[in-house]
UniProtKB/Swiss-Prot annotation:
Gene: NDE1
Protein name per the record: Nuclear distribution protein nudE homolog 1
Chain spans, region Disordered: 40-64, 220-310, 369-388, 397-666
Pfam family, one: NUDE_C
Biased composition (Polar residues): 251-274, 400-410, 587-599, 614-638
Length: 666
């Protein structure tokens, strides 16, 4: 512009002044605008500066606040860091403590499990011991109940025994009084009848009248009493006239039931002063031959006949007649006793009681077969009395030959001595045995006298109980084996009196009547004359083997029973057809034979039998012992004993200390 202004040329100075004045005015306007803009700018910048200062102050304040906050947050951060570290330390310590506690709890748990296992094993052992104790307690209770039952049976049998002893003693007293009357009558007759003057004389009318009187009394007594027919034997009972009366008496092959004189009777007979005729009483009391008792050495006629001349005594027939009167009186007493027993059975009520076995009056009073021998001495033409109708009926029911039957069933024949048949009616056929099949079977008492451990009555042995020793097994087995051996060897039965037991049996309990060995039925028992050498210190040689066998077979008996021999109830009862069938089947089963075919009669007999009462009906039957002796106990015997099939196993006892030691070793 300056260049432009330099290039401008003015025409006049006024133009130039005017031009320069214009320019001045322009520059002044421009300055004024610039000053206005500057002031405006200064004012706006001042406002902006104020705003900037305010904003800066706010920023500074905010920055200070933020710095303050940062400081506070840093402090909080440090605090939380320390807290976190403390918490971490606490957590680690707590974790380690919990780990240690967990380890301790694990060890305690293991110990508790071991102790619990030991406790469980001990508990099982205690429970097993408790079961064994309970079973032992049941066993002891069954033994106790059985002992109570046996005690009750013993008391009943003792009461029956006392009653029978009182009745027997009364009969013995009556018999002794009758014997005293006989001795007095004999004494009076011996003094009243004069002795013939010469050694050889004929029979007087008094002798004939006495013989007739004795025959009349003898026939009346035989017809009045229902005697069984005589037992058939090898020897003839009727002797010819040429033989003496002692030689004419035959020794029967069966048992004799003549009662042995009690010690009181023997003492009484020794205290009575001996007269010439009273010696016959002592001989007739114990002698088996009552017919020979009339002609004893006290009679002067017999003393004269021993000198070589046979002479009949006039007092002999009268003595026999008086003797038969006494026997008829004894028969009346015996029948009165039987009537009383029957009345007692009727009073007992509706229960059927087995009929009591009473000793045979024929064998007690010396009638029967010996009566036939007695009558043969006076008259050989005297016939035997007619047998009773009941006896003949029972004899027809059995085998026709008694000898064959006695070989098949020894001691079971109809005429076995020791039994009497009380006639209650002609048509009645009730067996008198305790094993009657038609009656409801009562529980047999192990102490019953008919409960014999022999092959003729029962073929079963006592049951073997593993935990219960039977008090009757040992004695019955010993008595049965000895009785069987003696029966097979044909020896006499062992005596129950005056024999000392062997050392083996000295500690056994006293015998019950069921343990008494049954006497053999093939030979008659010893006479009372034989008892004297057996009681003496040195027995005779004839009975040495017998006493030796008896000492090993007989257990010791109480001293109270020594000398008391009760002849009542000796011998087996008569067998009926059902009983014979039962014995045949039992013998076949014991001998190993095959089973017998069941017939119609067997079914009828089985239907007739009532159910046997037994406490083993809902329990296991006890196993039976081997019947080596050929005898068994009837299965219907009341028994309340629980029988285990096998004994409980022993309890293993493992102490807990041993288990702990074994675990520690593992």
């Amino acid at each position: 512009m300056v260049d432009d202004e330099d290039d401008i040329t003015f025409d006049s100075p006024e133009e130039e002044i005017a031009h320069y004045r214009e320019k001045y005015r322009q520059a002044l306007d421009m300055l004024t605008d610039t000053r206005a803009e500057l002031e405006e700018f200064q004012q706006s910048s001042k406002e902006l500066e104020d705003e900037m200062e305010q904003e800066l102050a706010a920023n500074d304040k905010q920055q200070a606040d933020l710095r303050e906050k940062i400081k506070r947050l840093d402090a909080e951060k440090e605090e939380w860091r320390t807290k976190h570290i403390a918490l971490q330390k606490m957590h680690s310590s707590t974790t380690s403590a919990m780990q240690r506690e967990m380890d301790n709890l694990r060890s305690e748990r293991d110990k508790t499990l071991v102790a619990l296992r030991d406790l469980e094993m001990g508990n099982d052992e205690l429970e097993r011991n408790e079961r064994v104790a309970i079973s032992s307690l049941l066993d002891l209770e069954s033994k106790y109940n059985r002992a109570i039952e046996e005690k009750t049976l013993l008391e009943q049998d003792l009461a029956q025994k006392d009653e029978l002893e009182t009745e027997t003693q009364r009969l013995k007293d009556e018999l002794r009084e009758a014997n005293e009357e006989i001795s007095i009558l004999k004494d009076q007759l011996a003094r009243a009848i004069a002795t013939p003057p010469s050694s050889v004389s004929t029979s007087s009318p008094i002798h004939d009248a006495a013989c007739d009187l004795s025959r009349i009394h003898l026939s009346d007594d035989i017809n009045a009493s229902p005697l069984p027919p005589p037992v058939p034997s090898k020897n003839k009972s009727i002797t010819p006239e040429g033989h003496s009366p002692r030689r004419g008496l035959s020794r029967s092959g069966t048992m004799s039931s003549i009662p042995v004189a009690s010690p009181s009777t023997k003492r009484f007979s020794q205290q009575i002063p001996h007269s010439p005729s009273f010696s016959t009483l002592s001989r007739s009391t114990t002698s088996r031959n009552l017919a020979a008792a009339a002609g004893t050495p006290g009679s002067p006629a017999l003393a004269r006949s021993r000198s070589g001349i046979p002479q009949a005594s006039p007092a002999r027939g009268i003595v026999l007649a008086s003797h038969q009167q006494t026997k008829s009186r004894g028969f009346k007493l015996l029948h009165d006793l039987q009537a009383r027993l029957k009345a007692t059975d009727d009073k007992l009520g509706g229960a059927k009681v087995p009929r009591r076995n009473v000793s045979n009056p024929a064998s007690v009073f010396g009638v029967g077969k010996r009566v036939t021998s007695t009558t043969s001495t006076t008259s050989s033409t005297t016939t035997a009395p007619a047998p009773h109708a009941r006896v003949t009926a029972l004899a027809k029911d059995h085998n026709t030959t008694p000898t064959a039957q006695s070989q098949q069933f020894p001691g079971s024949g109809i005429m076995s001595p020791g039994w009497v048949l009380v006639g209650e009616g002609e048509g009645e056929d009730t067996p008198t045995g305790p094993w009657s099949m038609t009656l409801p079977a009562e529980p047999n008492s192990p102490l019953d006298p008919t409960f014999r451990s022999s092959s003729t009555t029962s073929n079963r042995s006592l049951p073997s109980r593993p935990g219960i020793p039977s008090p009757l097994a040992s004695g019955s087995a010993r008595s049965t084996t000895s009785g069987t051996a003696q029966r097979q060897a044909g020896q006499r039965p062992s005596s129950r009196l005056g024999l000392k037991a062997s050392r083996r049996d000295s500690e056994a309990r006293p015998l019950s009547p069921s343990m008494i060995p049954v006497p053999s039925f093939s030979s008659r028992p010893m006479s009372p004359d034989v008892y004297q050498p057996l009681r003496s210190a040195t027995p005779t040689s004839g009975f040495s083997s017998f006493s030796a066998s008896a000492s090993t077979s007989n257990p010791p008996r109480p001293n109270s029973r020594t000398g008391k021999r009760n002849p009542i109830g000796r011998g087996p009862p008569p067998l009926s057809s059902s009983t014979r069938l039962h014995h045949q089947r039992s013998r076949q089963s014991l001998s190993g034979a095959g089973p017998t075919p069941t017939t119609g009669a067997d079914k009828v007999e089985r239907a007739k039998r009532g159910p046997r009462r037994s406490s083993l009906s809902n329990m296991d039957k006890p196993s039976l012992m081997s019947a080596s002796s050929g005898s068994r106990t009837p299965s219907g015997r009341p028994t309340s004993v629980h029988v285990f099939r096998e004994t409980p196993p022993p309890v293993p006892r493992i102490p807990s200390a041993i288990l702990k030691e074994s675990k520690v070793k593992k």
